[in-house]
Protein backbone atom coordinates (compact mmCIF):
# COMPACT_ATOMS: atom_id res chain seq x y z
CA UNK A 1 0.00 0.00 0.00
CA UNK A 2 1.02 3.59 -0.65
CA UNK A 3 0.65 6.11 2.18
CA UNK A 4 1.08 9.88 2.29
CA UNK A 5 4.58 10.55 3.63
CA UNK A 6 4.86 14.30 2.94
CA UNK A 7 2.73 17.20 1.76
CA UNK A 8 3.48 20.79 0.78
CA UNK A 9 1.45 23.76 -0.38
CA UNK A 10 1.99 27.13 -2.02
CA UNK A 11 0.41 30.56 -1.51
CA UNK A 12 -1.53 30.20 -4.79
CA UNK A 13 -3.33 27.12 -3.45
CA UNK A 14 -1.27 24.52 -5.36
CA UNK A 15 -0.17 21.46 -3.46
CA UNK A 16 2.20 18.50 -3.64
CA UNK A 17 1.53 15.09 -2.10
CA UNK A 18 4.30 12.50 -1.73
CA UNK A 19 3.10 8.92 -1.33
CA UNK A 20 5.46 6.14 -0.26
CA UNK A 21 5.33 2.37 -0.18
CA UNK A 22 6.90 0.40 2.67
CA UNK A 23 6.08 2.86 5.48
CA UNK A 24 5.07 1.66 8.95
CA UNK A 25 1.59 3.19 8.57
CA UNK A 26 -1.49 0.96 8.83
CA UNK A 27 -4.25 3.42 7.92
CA UNK A 28 -4.55 7.13 7.08
CA UNK A 29 -7.07 9.91 7.11
CA UNK A 30 -6.69 13.49 5.92
CA UNK A 31 -8.56 16.76 6.15
CA UNK A 32 -8.33 20.01 4.22
CA UNK A 33 -10.03 22.98 5.87
CA UNK A 34 -10.18 26.78 5.97
CA UNK A 35 -9.22 26.88 9.66
CA UNK A 36 -6.97 24.70 11.78
CA UNK A 37 -9.03 21.50 12.37
CA UNK A 38 -8.60 21.08 16.16
CA UNK A 39 -11.88 19.17 16.64
CA UNK A 40 -11.11 16.72 13.85
CA UNK A 41 -7.58 16.10 15.20
CA UNK A 42 -8.98 15.43 18.70
CA UNK A 43 -11.53 12.99 17.27
CA UNK A 44 -8.80 11.16 15.34
CA UNK A 45 -6.52 11.00 18.40
CA UNK A 46 -9.31 9.16 20.22
CA UNK A 47 -9.42 6.70 17.29
CA UNK A 48 -5.67 5.96 17.53
CA UNK A 49 -4.42 8.24 14.74
CA UNK A 50 -1.54 10.72 15.04
CA UNK A 51 -0.60 13.69 12.83
CA UNK A 52 2.14 12.54 10.45
CA UNK A 53 2.11 15.33 7.84
CA UNK A 54 0.84 18.88 7.74
CA UNK A 55 0.96 21.78 5.28
CA UNK A 56 -0.83 24.93 4.22
CA UNK A 57 -1.79 26.14 0.75
CA UNK A 58 -2.82 29.78 0.85
CA UNK A 59 -5.04 30.02 3.93
CA UNK A 60 -6.09 26.35 3.90
CA UNK A 61 -4.73 23.68 6.23
CA UNK A 62 -4.05 20.08 5.18
CA UNK A 63 -3.53 17.52 7.94
CA UNK A 64 -2.66 13.84 7.46
CA UNK A 65 -3.17 11.47 10.39
CA UNK A 66 -1.96 7.87 10.49
CA UNK A 67 -2.26 4.72 12.54
CA UNK A 68 1.02 2.90 13.13
CA UNK A 69 3.05 6.11 13.40
CA UNK A 70 5.22 5.00 16.32
CA UNK A 71 3.93 7.80 18.57
CA UNK A 72 2.45 7.26 22.02
CA UNK A 73 1.15 10.80 22.57
CA UNK A 74 0.86 14.05 20.67
CA UNK A 75 -0.02 17.68 21.21
CA UNK A 76 -0.46 20.84 19.12
CA UNK A 77 0.95 24.30 19.73
CA UNK A 78 -0.94 26.82 17.58
CA UNK A 79 -0.07 30.50 17.81
CA UNK A 80 -0.15 33.80 15.95
CA UNK A 81 3.55 34.14 16.73
CA UNK A 82 6.14 31.54 17.76
CA UNK A 83 4.90 29.55 20.81
CA UNK A 84 8.32 29.39 22.48
CA UNK A 85 7.10 28.78 26.03
CA UNK A 86 4.75 25.97 24.99
CA UNK A 87 7.41 24.25 22.87
CA UNK A 88 10.01 24.37 25.66
CA UNK A 89 7.47 23.01 28.15
CA UNK A 90 6.72 20.09 25.78
CA UNK A 91 10.43 19.43 25.15
CA UNK A 92 10.96 19.16 28.91
CA UNK A 93 8.15 16.56 29.02
CA UNK A 94 9.80 14.39 26.33
CA UNK A 95 7.93 15.60 23.24
CA UNK A 96 9.69 16.42 19.96
CA UNK A 97 8.54 18.56 17.02
CA UNK A 98 7.41 16.17 14.28
CA UNK A 99 5.48 18.51 11.94
CA UNK A 100 5.21 22.25 11.29
CA UNK A 101 3.06 24.44 9.04
CA UNK A 102 2.02 28.07 8.89
CA UNK A 103 -0.40 30.42 7.19
CA UNK A 104 0.23 34.18 7.03
CA UNK A 105 -1.31 34.62 10.50
CA UNK A 106 -0.85 31.29 12.35
CA UNK A 107 1.91 28.76 12.97
CA UNK A 108 1.21 25.18 14.09
CA UNK A 109 3.69 22.81 15.69
CA UNK A 110 2.90 19.14 16.24
CA UNK A 111 4.88 17.69 19.13
CA UNK A 112 4.94 13.93 19.59
CA UNK A 113 6.22 11.39 22.08
CA UNK A 114 7.74 8.29 20.48
CA UNK A 115 6.60 4.84 21.70
CA UNK A 116 10.23 3.89 22.21
CA UNK A 117 12.23 6.66 23.84
CA UNK A 118 15.25 7.63 21.72
CA UNK A 119 18.57 7.52 23.61
CA UNK A 120 19.29 11.27 23.64
CA UNK A 121 17.52 13.50 21.16
CA UNK A 122 18.05 17.26 21.13
CA UNK A 123 16.03 19.79 19.16
CA UNK A 124 16.51 23.45 18.34
CA UNK A 125 14.36 25.85 16.36
CA UNK A 126 15.44 28.77 14.22
CA UNK A 127 13.36 31.55 12.66
CA UNK A 128 14.99 33.44 9.80
CA UNK A 129 14.03 35.67 6.88
CA UNK A 130 16.10 33.56 4.43
CA UNK A 131 17.07 29.88 4.37
CA UNK A 132 19.91 29.47 6.91
CA UNK A 133 22.36 27.41 4.78
CA UNK A 134 25.48 28.26 6.81
CA UNK A 135 23.72 27.66 10.13
CA UNK A 136 22.43 24.27 8.91
CA UNK A 137 25.93 23.19 7.82
CA UNK A 138 27.34 24.19 11.22
CA UNK A 139 24.63 22.14 12.98
CA UNK A 140 25.25 19.13 10.70
CA UNK A 141 28.84 19.16 11.97
CA UNK A 142 27.37 18.76 15.50
CA UNK A 143 25.02 15.92 14.43
CA UNK A 144 21.86 18.05 14.40
CA UNK A 145 19.67 17.44 11.35
CA UNK A 146 16.57 19.12 9.87
CA UNK A 147 13.37 17.55 11.21
CA UNK A 148 10.88 20.01 9.73
CA UNK A 149 10.75 23.21 7.68
CA UNK A 150 7.83 25.54 7.13
CA UNK A 151 7.34 28.90 5.50
CA UNK A 152 5.48 31.70 7.24
CA UNK A 153 5.90 35.30 8.20
CA UNK A 154 8.76 36.32 10.47
CA UNK A 155 8.17 38.83 13.22
CA UNK A 156 11.05 41.06 14.28
Q: What residue ranges belong to the model's regions?
A:
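Terminus-proximal functional modules
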Residues: 1-156
Amino acid sequence: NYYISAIAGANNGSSLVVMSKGTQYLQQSYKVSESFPFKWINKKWREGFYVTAMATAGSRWAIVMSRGSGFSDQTVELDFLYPSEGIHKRWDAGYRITATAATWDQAAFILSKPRRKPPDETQETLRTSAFPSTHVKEKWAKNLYIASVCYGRTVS
